[in-house]
């Protein structure tokens, strides 16, 4: 108490109000963290154990069914307050309608394109995700894919293992000094930008929403429209959600604007690129190469595109690191618990 009195003397009224607000928030958070919650959780996909353990410690009953089939999900979802999914499970309107007691649909990851958000909102079901968890993992993959394209690493590896010493055929290009165009400068886009700056790349950015001013100042990013970005960049990486506005954002017209020496990287959502249009510009040499971690159909069926020598493919592994999956599971569990406690 003596300490609080001394602090009070030094503070004006506004400062005291702010201090009391902080103290009250800390006390409320401390109190809420010890409050047990009740409810049942259905985990429909494989997630890290840390999140399951957190929900159980909070008092929730957790049923873990990572291989649940659509028909079983529809018939059993009525018994649960919380539905936890990754990308495999499709939370359709049929599933939402059957979830008669659901309060939360939680996506352990970034995108929500496998959840009928509109149907959930109509039923007053909270839809949450963990976009912050995968940021570093996705960003590192993008850098890896850029280097793979620039130095033909997949081809170099495959030919060397076959006993073919094709050193003279593998003339690459450096990332240093090149222009990286970032389409969608959100959390992931900014992380990639910082990593690219460490490689001495120059940044060009496009986003329909305002880009963080501090980030622009920190990195020297040139902010421009999409067409100018495509015409100027040596590498283009895409980080936008799947929406009607972004479907086939990279169509024939926009792909034709890119330099013939440029590379396109997509780790966001498959349908932002028209794969048939991409195949044509890559096959004709109007685009140097592409790296794809996501596809219009997954697993992908466009074998012609995948088998091109100037295409690097990965099976949607952007967030597939131990650290990212552990963090996503932890973040989602904490959000679920705090919502049920009424804290958020």
What are these regions (language model features)?
Residues 4, 13-15, 21-34, 121, ...:
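C-terminal helix-to-coil terminal segments
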Residues 5, 19-128, 231, 251-257:
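An N-terminal-biased, well-structured beta-alpha scaffold segment characteristic
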Residues 81-82, 104, 235, 263, ...:
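Short, Asp-centered acidic motifs that coordinate Mg2+ and/or phosphate
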Residues 89-96, 208-304, 320:
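Rossmann-like adenosine-cofactor binding region
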Residues 123, 131-179, 194, 198, ...:
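Phosphate-binding beta-alpha-beta segment of Rossmann-like dinucleotide-binding domains, i.e.
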Residues 185-186:
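Glycine-rich Rossmann-fold phosphate-binding loop(s) that bind the pyrophosphate
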Residues 189-190:
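N-terminal Rossmann-fold NAD(P) dinucleotide-binding loop
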């Amino acid at each position: 108490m003596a300490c609080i009195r001394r602090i009070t003397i030094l503070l004006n009224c506004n400062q005291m109000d702010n201090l009391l607000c902080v103290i009250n928030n800390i006390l409320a958070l401390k109190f809420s963290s010890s409050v047990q919650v009740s409810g049942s959780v259905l985990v429909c996909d494989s997630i890290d154990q840390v999140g399951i353990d957190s929900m159980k410690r909070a008092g929730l009953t957790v049923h873990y069914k990572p291989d649940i089939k659509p028909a079983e999900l529809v018939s059993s979802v009525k018994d649960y307050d919380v539905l936890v999914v990754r990308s495999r499970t499709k939370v359709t309107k049929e599933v939402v309608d059957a979830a008669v007691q659901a309060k939360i649909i939680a996506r352990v990851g970034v995108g929500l394109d496998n959840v009928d958000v509109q149907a959930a909102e109509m039923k007053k079901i909270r839809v949450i995700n963990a976009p912050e968890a995968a940021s570093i993992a996705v960003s590192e993959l993008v850098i890896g894919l850029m280097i793979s394209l620039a130095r033909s690493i997949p081809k170099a590896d495959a030919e060397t293992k076959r006993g073919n010493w094709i050193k003279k055929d593998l003339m690459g290009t450096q990332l240093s000094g090149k222009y990286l165009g970032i389409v969608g400068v959100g959390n992931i886009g900014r992380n990639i930008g910082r990593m690219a700056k460490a490689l001495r790349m120059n940044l060009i950015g496009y986003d329909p929403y305002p880009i963080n001013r501090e980030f622009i100042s920190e990195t020297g990013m040139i902010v421009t429209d999409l067409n100018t970005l495509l015409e100027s960049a040596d590498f283009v990486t895409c980080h936008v959600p799947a929406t009607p506005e972004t479907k086939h954002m990279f169509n024939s017209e926009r792909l034709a604007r890119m330099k013939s020496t440029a590379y396109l990287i997509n780790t966001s959502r498959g349908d932002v690129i028209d794969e048939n249009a991409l195949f044509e510009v890559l096959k004709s040499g109007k685009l140097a190469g592409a790296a794809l971690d996501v596809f219009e159909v997954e697993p992908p069926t466009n074998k012609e595109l995948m088998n091109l020598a100037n295409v690097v493919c990965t099976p949607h592994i952007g967030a597939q690191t131990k650290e990212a999956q552990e963090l996503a599971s932890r973040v989602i569990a904490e959000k679920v618990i705090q919502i049920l406690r009424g804290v958020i």
